[in-house]
């Protein structure tokens, strides 16, 4: 029985990245042997065990044979005669198929170290095409390691296209699609996840609402990049620069979905996209099972971003109406991420990335003034019932007028 450190821990140490999780592969053992050593069985689909002391995962070396459709359509063989090289062969990318022995020796039968040096994401074998989840995983790794210069090998991109054409991606569950998308949001370049899926054709299958944005024109006066899909990628990049918050990054990526259904006769204008996008975001979030906090923020950004961009033109009562709809009186923490998304939208335009966004400060100032109007003061003044809300709004409007010098 031999134990090796494998996968991401070996890869990240070679990239001088802090290793957070360690996975181990055990060669020459059995479930009975692992049980006798005190390891706890946790794997349902194949033999995986938790170390009783470290709680790290130890998996028996195994091979996989395609036996059905989708990423679960595999038959596993995990007997003691499975070699380390056979176990590494089933892995997705060469950079993830390096093992380390307890003496520090690296076992690298598929040249993963060279691909790390060359900054290349390359499949281990043609068995890559047996698992549709690997398309999303490669896109996520492309996003995660983009800042280090990694790109997808042309031959791997070809196999990703083969997988897409096979129809296998339709068997991915909503949970797995969201899991990979959500992980990509935490990378320095989440837009690369989307652009990689677009390049191989997978975006049209797993996230058709986003795919529909590519090729849709916008007014060149406001959007020198013209293409709404390109704009969306730029906004995703800007949001990642502005915020570490994942719901904020998600909302920025989907804020313009309504432009994908604008009638061609109305191009390049998209006057109703803030309205039409709401239905699309709801449908997308329901299908992919996006958490409610992500969904709620995305809907607010979609509905209000155009008005926020027009902050300099808004009347005081319009500010109050927007704040009412956002429910920021009860949930003031909502305002900051909404404004950050709008700032990312503003900056996600070709050649205008560093242009100031005074609208953000104007909205912040308006809210600071309005929130200082106290309900108790309105009640103390003798207002009752429905009069309270009406008077509260009036006082808030006056506060915004005074703060922003609106006549």
UniProtKB/Swiss-Prot annotation:
Swiss-Prot/TrEMBL cofactor(s): Mg(2+); Ni(2+)
Cofactor binding note: Magnesium is required for nucleotidyltransferase activity. Nickel for phosphatase activity.
UniProt binding sites for CTP: 8, 11, 91, 137, 140
Sequence positions that bind Mg(2+): 21, 23
Keywords annotated in UniProt: ATP-binding, Hydrolase, Magnesium, Metal-binding, Multifunctional enzyme, Nickel, Nucleotide-binding, Nucleotidyltransferase, RNA repair, RNA-binding, Transferase, tRNA processing
Domain named HD: residues: 228-329
Reactions this protein catalyses: a tRNA precursor + 2 CTP + ATP = a tRNA with a 3' CCA end + 3 diphosphate; a tRNA with a 3' CCA end + 2 CTP + ATP = a tRNA with a 3' CCACCA end + 3 diphosphate
EC number: 2.7.7.72, 3.1.3.-, 3.1.4.-
Organism superkingdom: Bacteria
Biological process terms in GO annotation: RNA repair; tRNA 3'-terminal CCA addition
Binding, ATP: 8, 11, 91, 137, 140
InterPro entries registered for this protein in UniProt: CCA_bact (IPR012006), HD/PDEase_dom (IPR003607), HD_domain (IPR006674), NT_sf (IPR043519), PolA_pol_head_dom (IPR002646), PolyA_RNA-bd (IPR032828), tRNA_CCA-adding_enzyme (IPR050124)
Gene Ontology molecular function: any one: magnesium ion binding
Comment field (misc): A single active site specifically recognizes both ATP and CTP and is responsible for their addition.
Subunit structure, as described in the record: Monomer. Can also form homodimers and oligomers.
UniProt free text on domains: Comprises two domains: an N-terminal domain containing the nucleotidyltransferase activity and a C-terminal HD domain associated with both phosphodiesterase and phosphatase activities.
Known function: Catalyzes the addition and repair of the essential 3'-terminal CCA sequence in tRNAs without using a nucleic acid template. Adds these three nucleotides in the order of C, C, and A to the tRNA nucleotide-73, using CTP and ATP as substrates and producing inorganic pyrophosphate. tRNA 3'-terminal CCA addition is required both for tRNA processing and repair. Also involved in tRNA surveillance by mediating tandem CCA addition to generate a CCACCA at the 3' terminus of unstable tRNAs. While stable tRNAs receive only 3'-terminal CCA, unstable tRNAs are marked with CCACCA and rapidly degraded.
Protein family membership: Belongs to the tRNA nucleotidyltransferase/poly(A) polymerase family. Bacterial CCA-adding enzyme type 1 subfamily.
Name of the protein described by the UniProt record: Multifunctional CCA protein
Organism, scientific name: Aliivibrio fischeri (strain ATCC 700601 / ES114)
Phylogenetic lineage: Bacteria, Pseudomonadati, Pseudomonadota, Gammaproteobacteria, Vibrionales
């Amino acid at each position: 029985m031999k134990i090796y450190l494998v996968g991401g821990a070996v890869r990240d140490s070679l990239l001088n990245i802090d290793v957070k999780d360690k996975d181990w592969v055990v060669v020459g053992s059995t479930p009975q042997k692992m049980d006798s050593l005190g390891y706890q069985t946790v794997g349902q689909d194949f033999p995986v065990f938790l170390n009783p002391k470290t709680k790290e995962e130890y998996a028996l070396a195994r091979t996989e044979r395609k036996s059905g459709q989708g990423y679960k359509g595999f038959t596993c063989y995990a007997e003691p005669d499975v070699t380390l090289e056979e176990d590494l062969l089933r892995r997705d990318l060469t950079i993830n198929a390096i093992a380390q022995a307890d003496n520090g020796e690296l076992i690298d039968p598929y040249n993963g170290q060279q691909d790390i040096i060359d900054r290349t994401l390359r499949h281990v074998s043609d068995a890559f095409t047996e698992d549709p989840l690997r398309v999303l995983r490669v896109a996520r790794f492309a996003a995660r390691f983009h800042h280090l210069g990694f790109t997808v090998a042309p031959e791997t991109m070809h196999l990703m296209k083969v997988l897409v054409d096979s129809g296998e991606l339709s068997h991915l569950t909503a949970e797995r699609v969201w899991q990979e998308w959500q992980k990509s949001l935490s990378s320095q370049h989440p837009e690369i996840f989307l652009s990689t899926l677009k390049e191989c054709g997978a975006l049209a299958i797993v996230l058709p609402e986003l795919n529909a944005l590519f090729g849709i024109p916008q007014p060149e006066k406001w959007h020198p990049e013209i293409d709404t899909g390109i704009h969306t990628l730029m906004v995703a990049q800007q949001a990642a620069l502005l915020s570490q918050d994942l719901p904020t990054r998600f909302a920025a990526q989907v804020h313009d979905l309504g432009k994908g259904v604008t009638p061609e006769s109305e191009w390049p204008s998209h006057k109703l996209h803030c309205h039409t996008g709401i239905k699309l975001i709801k449908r997308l979030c329901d299908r992919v099972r996006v958490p409610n906090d992500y969904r709620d923020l995305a809907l607010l950004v979609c509905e209000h971003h155009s008005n926020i961009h027009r902050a300099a033109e808004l009347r005081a009562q319009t500010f109050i109406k927007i704040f009412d709809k956002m429910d920021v009186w009860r949930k003031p923490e909502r305002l900051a991420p909404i404004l950050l998304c709008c700032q990312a939208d503003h900056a996600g335009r070709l050649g205008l990335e560093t242009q100031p966004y005074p609208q953000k400060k104007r909205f912040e100032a308006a809210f600071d003034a309005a929130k200082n109007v106290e309900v108790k003061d309105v009640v103390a003044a003798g207002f009752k019932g429905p009069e309270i809300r009406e008077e509260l709004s009036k006082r808030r409007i006056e506060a915004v007028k005074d703060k922003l010098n609106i006549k």
